[in-house]
């Protein structure tokens, strides 16, 4: 039997083999909100006899003892990529670089240096490379790394630009999808940052049409709340590199009880119940006071929230108290974001309040040392991603702190219990901040005048 691989693996199976392959690439995912499992299918019919499965699932044919002739029509686009100026760490990055020779996932915690390793692999494979990012901020971070380590200007797709001439091109996923057909056979290597999003429609659209010879997925977590991580192998195969945790400091979790109830009334939409918490004066005052406390202790504090009005209210109050503040939200211009990050890195203690969607993934501002989660979070991977923003090692930086706010009521306590399980699983120290401990901390921050 002949199997042709390009963007997918195309073949002519008999009914028995196709029934097996079809079942093995069909997933039934249980959800909390649906009475029945949701079905996802990652195989299909091209014509009466021609079927397709993911390239990375040829193991299904091997499992049935099928002998086949492989015709590889994937894109190879050799280019000269300059040798990068960085040096890989021998204890964790270099072994992966030496072993990696095909499509795979690199599952490294924040601080591991996934960006550097991926750029090294782009150099190793020597193929015209496309880096796909979740947003423009991360895209600009990748572009800056290419300039810094390779000494050339990368191509950019997005923000009104379409330059695919350089050997490395960086784009955000939304723009790539618009040009998917034209780009499907241009690149020999595709690197997908924050690959845990890859089973979302916006990512699968391009991955399913791309004929790139090498596909590399990067992520700090391979967990998804919806369970769709079972499909990762259909896009990046079974090879997963999970390096040990290095180059980071484990945070200490300071847990504060907030006298605000999170309603458990299922008849009220979640967004409205969350709004009741976010709009509560006690909740807002708690975040303001804690941000003021930790900045006075010398921290560079990051507050994340998914409510712009809450971010702006908190920053206004802190500014009135004389605290140096910064804001990064969706409306913040890209150049302004970069300038803010530069000012924070060079400056003293401050508070940065930012949109959670921007800072939950990939933004590297290593000088941040304290995280205040200003949203109601009950998602293991999101907690780990956010905590990673303050875990990176920088000379002179204070030991990282993550501030956990515990709401009243059964729902609030259940969420707090879920977050506590994440902290335990990661081996992070937790401290319950009783009123007495909070007073002691305030005396350290503000002196006896507090």
Curated annotation (Swiss-Prot):
Q: Which keywords does this chain's UniProt record carry?
A: ATP-binding, DNA-binding, Early protein, Helicase, Hydrolase, Nucleotide-binding
Domain spans labelled Helicase C-terminal: 289-439
Q: Where is this motif: DEAH box?
A: 193-196
Q: Induction of this protein: by what?
A: Expressed in the early phase of the viral replicative cycle.
Q: Which SMART domains match?
A: DEXDc, HELICc
- The question of whether Transcription regulation is a record keyword is answered with no
Look at the named UniProt entry and state the broad enzyme category this protein falls under: hydrolase
EC nos: 3.6.4.-
Residues annotated as domain Helicase ATP-binding:
95-240
InterPro entries (UniProt xref): ATP-dep_DNA_Helicase, Helicase/UvrB_N, Helicase_ATP-bd, Helicase_C-like, P-loop_NTPase
Catalytic reactions on record: ATP + H2O = ADP + phosphate + H(+)
Gene Ontology MF terms: ATP binding; ATP hydrolysis activity; ATP-dependent activity, acting on DNA; DNA binding; four-way junction helicase activity
The protein depicted here goes by the name Probable helicase D10
Per the UniProt record, the source organism is Escherichia phage T5
Gene name linked to the record? D10
